[in-house]
UniProtKB/Swiss-Prot annotation:
Obligatory cofactor(s): NAD(+)
Sorted UniProt keywords: Glycosidase, Hydrolase, NAD, Signal
Protein name: Glycosyl hydrolase family 109 protein
Organism of origin: Shewanella putrefaciens (strain CN-32 / ATCC BAA-453)
Cell wall biogenesis/degradation found in the keyword field: no
InterPro entries membership: Gfo/Idh/MocA-like_OxRdtase_N, Gfo/Idh/MocA_oxidrdct_glycsds, Glyco_hydro_109_C, NAD(P)-bd_dom_sf, TAT_signal, TAT_signal_bac_arc
């Protein structure tokens, strides 16, 4: 939703913090055993929902991110925008006006209080729900969406505690409904090209990946009463770890077939001092301003290392505070070579275009000509026209709708969502325990060993 009152944030964040304290007291180091919970339903790996001639969509939250999804859905065929819900009238009016302007029927509106979304969920003419709300609402809304018989599509991150992750997994298995965390970066042109190259063996056997969310967002602290900064800022006062791991980690996980033949085993994490936000507040706000009364505890830079069961390593970084250029790293090293992003560059020992692997090949066009992903070949021009983070948003939503209308499994499932998001919690636990390792829960309950690998992904 566009806005959440501060008291609701503080209540939710306080509960999260209390849960973390308990977890940190009881957690051990690498010996920390995370036994799978009893299963209450069939695994949803490869879940295929009955084909939908038309995908009927409801939106919970149509503020900044949610409105972007509304815009993109208006460009898609085979969808009906049935209803929207938000607590902020201005963004409701904007969304309705845009939908009508696109010559689509006016959606039903639900508003009034924080629980108005339940009226939307009570309808029987909605197939999927797009959830774009502050983080603390993601888990309860996703669970209630599936309980209401609908498929849940949730903004990142999926959840804020290990228990929430398990509750969502359990609900998906019991209801046999999809719960996809909408990790849009997996649908970027470069990321999908690398996936294509990996599946064709260009880099050899995979050894190591590097992922990040490096995005200077101090300016969001000036969003006091509404917009993302009005609630996101407070997380820097409540947790110390990787607050936002999935943008970089999602693509690297799919390159490595995490939860489809390999899985995360354990993590170790450490944070730098937390200095930048307090300095920014002192510089940009009056001394008595609310932003100067907060105690910022989240380290400006968090670095985590993940070990997989097959022995691969992944470095994951988070930094939304320091003055530096944007990066997600997107580095993948194999036995035959390496791809690195920001800027994009490649070095391979065999199968390249004549350059030595001792120097970077930064001429990407010839690599696109040979390995551009089938999805981008098919709808890349539409994606570039419709935009959304360079087109990745459009490709993601197009692919979601395609799978639902054609009876195909989604590219990301609830186990991916839980595994990528839980880095938030586990990094916090490790930081608070002198960077000792913390074991990942196996949300698949062992099914990862026999799950079919993710293919090149096409349409």
């Amino acid at each position: 939703m566009h806005n959440i009152h501060r008291r609701h944030f503080l209540k939710a964040a306080g509960a999260v913090t209390a849960g973390l304290i308990t977890a940190n007291i009881t957690a051990s180091t690498h010996a920390n055993s995370v036994a799978p919970k009893p299963q209450n339903g069939k695994s949803v790996i490869g879940l295929i929902a009955p084909k939908m001639d038309v995908v009927r969509v409801g939106f919970i939250g149509v503020g900044e991110r949610g409105f972007s999804h509304v815009e993109q859905f208006c460009h898609l065929e085979g969808v009906e925008l049935k209803a929207i819900c938000d607590t902020h009238q201005t963004v409701i009016d904007r969304a309705v006006a845009h939908i009508v302007k696109q010559n689509r029927p006016q959606p039903t509106v639900y508003t009034g209080d924080d629980l108005s979304y339940r009226d939307l969920l009570s309808r029987d003419d909605i197939d999927i729900v797009i959830i774009s709300t502050p983080w603390e609402w993601h888990a309860p809304m996703a669970i209630e969406t599936m309980e209401s018989g609908k498929h849940a599509f949730v903004e990142v991150p999926l959840a804020l505690t290990v228990e929430e992750c398990w509750q969502i997994v359990d609900t998906a298995e019991r209801t046999q409904k999809n719960c996809m965390m909408m990790e849009n970066v997996n649908y970027g042109r470069e990321e999908l090209m690398v996936l294509n190259m990996v599946r064709q063996g260009v880099f050899g056997e995979l050894l190591h990946g590097e992922a990040a969310y490096i995005h200077e967002l101090r300016w969001q602290m000036k969003e006091i009463d509404h917009k993302t900064g009005s609630w996101r800022t407070y997380w820097h006062t409540k947790r110390n770890g990787n607050l936002y791991p999935t943008h970089g980690l999602g693509p690297v996980s799919q390159y490595m077939n995490i939860n489809r033949g390999d899985r995360f085993d354990y993590l170790t994490s450490m944070s730098s001092p937390a200095l930048g936000r307090a300095l920014y507040a002192k510089r940009e706000f009056p001394a008595d301003h609310e932003r100067n009364q907060l105690k910022y505890i989240n380290g400006d830079i968090n670095t985590s290392l993940i070990k997989t069961v097959k022995g691969r390593t992944i470095m994951v970084q988070h930094d939304t505070t320091t003055p530096r250029p944007y990066s997600r790293h997107n580095l993948l090293q194999g036995t035959n070579g390496v791809f690195a992003g920001f800027p994009n560059r490649i070095a391979v020992e065999h199968g390249g275009f004549g350059k030595s692997y001792h120097e970077w090949d930064m001429d990407m066009q010839k690599w696109y000509d040979k390995y551009d992903h089938p999805l981008w070949q098919r709808i890349g021009k539409e994606a570039e026209i419709n935009g959304g983070h360079g087109g990745m948003d459009f490709v993601m939503l197009w692919r979601m709708v395609y799978c639902l209308r054609n009876g195909e499994a989604l590219d990301q499932d609830v186990y991916d969502a839980a595994s990528w998001s839980v880095v938030n919690i586990l990094s916090e636990q490790s930081v608070n325990n002198r960077s000792n390792s913390v074991t990942f829960p196996d949300f698949t309950r062992g099914a990862w060993e026999h799950a079919k690998p993710l293919g090149i992904v096409g349409a």
